[in-house]
């Protein structure tokens, strides 16, 4: 099954709910790619020996990896951490996440500042470009196991919105204007 993504409603209800508009407005992988979001569907049951994952890591220079179990039983200050993840922010580097178990949502802003909700389920690997406004939350299952990938030493420094003058944000916006200027292989 392919990645599911949609435009979100404006409700302030529980962030762990799907927040579909009525009627639903689904978002294609092509539209996500226009925003710089890349996607691969992999086999989470065999991630340690997955040649496709190894190739992605090699091609993109992802030389550091760790695993993160997010659930109330395994994370101290769980609610506080979720609140931090759900605060809209950017990063200087790509954010690369591979869902191995459970599920959750990455929300990204499109070029018209609308929220798009991306439902991460087992096997989904996404790359969010540096400079894109985004946030993360678990869904109602309250559990996700993610592989985090990095180029070099892991750095996860959020820069909360507004960041319009941040050089990475400016570069991202410039890239949107020029459609990123290169062909990127993902599916």
UniProtKB/Swiss-Prot annotation:
InterPro entries reported for this sequence: ARD, ARD_euk, RmlC-like_jellyroll, RmlC_Cupin_sf
Annotated protein name in UniProt: Acireductone dioxygenase 4
Main localization of the protein described in the UniProt heading: cytoplasm
PANTHER family for the chain: ACIREDUCTONE DIOXYGENASE, ACIREDUCTONE DIOXYGENASE 4
Positions of Ni(2+) binding: 89, 91, 95, 134
One cellular-component annotation, GO: nucleus
Catalytic activity field: 1,2-dihydroxy-5-(methylsulfanyl)pent-1-en-3-one + O2 = 4-methylsulfanyl-2-oxobutanoate + formate + 2 H(+); 1,2-dihydroxy-5-(methylsulfanyl)pent-1-en-3-one + O2 = 3-(methylsulfanyl)propanoate + CO + formate + 2 H(+)
Assigned keywords, A-Z: Acetylation, Amino-acid biosynthesis, Cytoplasm, Dioxygenase, Iron, Metal-binding, Methionine biosynthesis, Nickel, Nucleus, Oxidoreductase
Functional pathway: Amino-acid biosynthesis; L-methionine biosynthesis via salvage pathway; L-methionine from S-methyl-5-thio-alpha-D-ribose 1-phosphate: step 5/6
Organism, scientific name: Arabidopsis thaliana
Family: Belongs to the acireductone dioxygenase (ARD) family.
EC number(s) reported in the record: 1.13.11.54, 1.13.11.53
Pfam families: ARD
Domain of life: Eukaryota
Cofactor annotation remark: Binds either 1 Fe or Ni cation per monomer. Iron-binding promotes an acireductone dioxygenase reaction producing 2-keto-4-methylthiobutyrate, while nickel-binding promotes an acireductone dioxygenase reaction producing 3-(methylsulfanyl)propanoate.
Chain positions found as N-acetylalanine: 2
Gene Ontology BP term (one): L-methionine salvage from methylthioadenosine
Role played: Catalyzes 2 different reactions between oxygen and the acireductone 1,2-dihydroxy-3-keto-5-methylthiopentene (DHK-MTPene) depending upon the metal bound in the active site. Fe-containing acireductone dioxygenase (Fe-ARD) produces formate and 2-keto-4-methylthiobutyrate (KMTB), the alpha-ketoacid precursor of methionine in the methionine recycle pathway. Ni-containing acireductone dioxygenase (Ni-ARD) produces methylthiopropionate, carbon monoxide and formate, and does not lie on the methionine recycle pathway.
Molecular functions per Gene Ontology: acireductone dioxygenase (Ni2+-requiring) activity; acireductone dioxygenase [iron(II)-requiring] activity; iron ion binding; nickel cation binding
Entry binding sites for Fe(2+): 89, 91, 95, 134
Compartments where found: Cytoplasm; Nucleus
């Amino acid at each position: 099954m392919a990645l599911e993504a949609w435009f979100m409603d404006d409700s302030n209800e529980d962030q762990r709910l799907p927040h579909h508009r009525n009627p639903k407005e689904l978002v294609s992988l092509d539209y996500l790619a226009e925003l710089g979001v890349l996607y691969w569907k992999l086999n989470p049951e065999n991630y340690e020996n997955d040649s496709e994952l190894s190739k992605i890591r090699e091609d993109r220079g992802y030389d550091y990896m760790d695993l993160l179990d997010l659930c109330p039983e395994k994370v101290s200050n769980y609610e506080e951490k979720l609140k931090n993840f759900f605060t809209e922010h950017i990063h200087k580097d790509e954010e690369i996440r591979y869902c191995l178990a459970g599920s959750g949502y990455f929300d990204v802003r499109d070029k018209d500042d609308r929220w798009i909700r991306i439902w991460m389920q087992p096997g989904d690997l996404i790359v969010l470009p540096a400079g894109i406004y985004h946030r993360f939350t678990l869904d109602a299952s309250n559990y996700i196991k993610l592989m985090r990938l990095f180029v070099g030493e892991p750095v996860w420094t959020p820069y909360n919105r507004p960041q319009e003058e941040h050089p990475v944000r400016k570069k991202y916006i410039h890239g949107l204007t020029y459609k990123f200027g290169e062909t990127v292989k993902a599916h």
